């Protein structure tokens, strides 16, 4: 369906049997032999005892290696090297046992290969290389397992998103790289990804709110069984209580504010008054340039429009070949993979596409969230403002209640006049890095709408800040290849 700006917008309000297009290669996953767990300790006491026993055994072995007179012909350096090698391997194993990490057949095979390679290298190549590989066998044995996405869960996830209201991040639970943990009844779910032993939760749970507390408890138990530590990114203020009890979560998580949603109250939004003057001027400029807009469902794109929009992607400063983002982005642009996706397209006076915005829907059509805006280099000024304003107008006609434009990261750094020294340093760094991360430019755009909403938080353990920084930065900024 195609709708010109100002015509009713179809948000699939009364169409629960929406088409979900899945990649053709997706099949129901089977448990592979290499993923079979061969050692699993699910008792914390047993983990502590096992780790302590391994450390004691290592100390005893090191004492034998270092002091046994029958090996007096060994050089001191050789005894020390073997002692450190054994200690390193045992330390890796003890840490993995303490964290409750299971050992799969693949882990055992990899550890055996490391050990054999280390012994061979020690005899044939170099002592140091052999010792590193032998120590690495303990590291390979206890390497954390990972969760793998199940594309066939998309219809279930979409049904829960369609039942979730007033959560601007709910549609992004569909992102292809995310795994999902469902409640026992399947009426609620969490989206998450795993990375180097951390389970990073994306946003709030979706679905039946009454199931959220038990869902979080079940998810925490599942994480402990796999030896994963929990991190939550994009948690809303009203859901902080779900993660506040260390007895339930199994660890203490500290909330750190990272920004605020920008949500338009659609029914009451009017571009009138002095404070909207800059927005009105930007929109008016596009009218003067002869810019027009149209709205189309992504799954209903014809070949001509898809080719035109793909050309805009290729000409966009954001890049055409990669996706980025974790908590507040989808992927698969123009693929028609996800249900409920609407595109609003801007054309200049000659009919050439200059830009488009991608919106995801939730709550049976009550909520819309902007995914990613795309525009050509050199597109007329005000294109983004015009696309946002026209989508708000169309959403109002369609009965949409809330429209999320984006997420304003650290708005207090940009909006406050009085800043401390650390805040000034942070703002200066953000200003310098703006060509890469565009936080300051995004804030300048969003403040024209005067629609800052509730805060979002990242929930982390303060004892693991540096490792978590690496994990979160890799999830947000490491590019993923896009297929068009």
Swiss-Prot record:
Name the UniProt key words of this record, in alphabetical order: Cell inner membrane, Cell membrane, Membrane, Transmembrane, Transmembrane helix
* Family per record: Belongs to the LPG synthetase family.
Q: What else is known?
A: Expression in M.smegmatis increases cell resistance to human beta-defensin 2 (hBD-2) and to sodium nitrite. It also reduces the negative charge on the bacterial surface upon exposure to an acidic environment, enhances bacterial cell viability at lethal acidic pH and induces a slowdown in biofilm formation.
Its source organism is Mycobacterium tuberculosis (strain ATCC 25618 / H37Rv)
Bilayer disposition of the protein:
Multi-pass membrane protein
Q: A Pfam family matched by this chain, by name?
A: LPG_synthase_C
- Where is it found, in Gene Ontology cellular component terms? plasma membrane
**Identification of the protein by name:** MprF-like domain protein Rv1619
One term of GO molecular function: aminoacyltransferase activity
Print the domain comment field. Unlike homologous domains of MprF and LysX that are positioned in the cytoplasm, the MprF-like domain of LysX2 is in the extracytoplasmic region.
Which locations, inside or outside the cell, does it occupy?
Cell inner membrane
> Where does it mainly reside?
membrane
Q: Does the keyword Transmembrane apply?
A: yes
* Cytoplasmic topological intervals: 1-47, 101-113, 479-484
């Amino acid at each position: 369906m195609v709708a010109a700006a100002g015509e009713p917008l179809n948000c699939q309000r009364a169409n629960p049997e929406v088409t979900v297009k899945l990649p053709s290669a997706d099949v129901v996953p089977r448990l592979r032999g290499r993923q079979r767990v061969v050692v699993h300790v699910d008792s914390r006491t047993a983990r502590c005892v096992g780790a302590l026993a391994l450390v004691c055994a290592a100390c005893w072995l090191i004492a034998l290696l270092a002091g046994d007179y029958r090996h007096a012909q060994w050089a001191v350096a050789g005894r020390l090297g073997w002692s450190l090698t054994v200690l390193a391997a045992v330390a890796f194993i003890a840490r993995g046992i303490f964290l409750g990490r299971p050992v799969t057949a693949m882990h055992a095979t990899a550890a055996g290969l490391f050990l054999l390679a280390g012994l061979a290298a020690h005899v044939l190549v170099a002592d140091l290389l052999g010792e590193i590989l032998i120590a690495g066998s303990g590291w390979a044995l206890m390497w954390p397992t990972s969760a793998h996405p199940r594309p066939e869960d998309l219809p279930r996830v979409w049904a829960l998103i369609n039942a979730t209201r007033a959560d601007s991040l709910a549609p992004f639970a569909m992102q292809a790289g995310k795994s999902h943990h469902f409640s026992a009844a399947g009426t609620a779910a969490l989206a998450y990804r795993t990375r180097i032993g951390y389970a990073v939760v994306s946003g709030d749970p979706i679905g039946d709110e009454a199931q959220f507390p038990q869902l979080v408890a079940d998810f925490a138990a599942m994480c402990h069984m796999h030896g994963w530590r929990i991190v939550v990114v994009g948690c809303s203020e009203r859901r902080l209580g779900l993660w506040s009890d260390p007895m339930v979560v199994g660890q203490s998580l500290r909330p750190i504010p990272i920004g605020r949603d920008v949500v338009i109250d659609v029914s009451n939004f009017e571009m009138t008054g002095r404070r909207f003057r800059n927005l009105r001027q930007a929109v008016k400029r596009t009218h003067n340039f002869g810019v027009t807009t149209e709205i189309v469902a992504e799954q209903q794109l014809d070949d001509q429009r898809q080719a035109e929009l793909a050309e805009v992607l290729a000409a966009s400063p954001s890049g055409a070949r990669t996706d980025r983002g974790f908590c507040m982005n989808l992927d698969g642009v123009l693929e028609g993979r996800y249900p409920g996706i609407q595109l609003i397209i801007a054309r200049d006076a000659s009919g050439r596409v200059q830009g488009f915005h991608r919106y995801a829907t939730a709550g049976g059509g009550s909520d819309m969230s902007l995914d990613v805006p795309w525009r050509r280099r050199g597109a007329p000024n005000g294109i983004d403002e015009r696309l946002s304003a026209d989508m708000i107008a169309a959403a109002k006609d369609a009965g949409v209640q809330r429209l999320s434009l984006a997420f304003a990261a650290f708005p207090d750094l940009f909006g406050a006049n009085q800043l401390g020294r650390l805040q000034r340093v942070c703002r200066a760094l953000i200003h310098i890095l703006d060509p890469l991360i565009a936080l300051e430019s995004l804030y300048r755009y969003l403040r024209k709408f005067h629609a800052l909403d509730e805060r979002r938080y990242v929930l982390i353990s303060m004892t693991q800040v540096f490792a978590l920084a690496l994990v979160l930065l890799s999830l947000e900024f490491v590019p993923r290849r896009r297929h068009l």
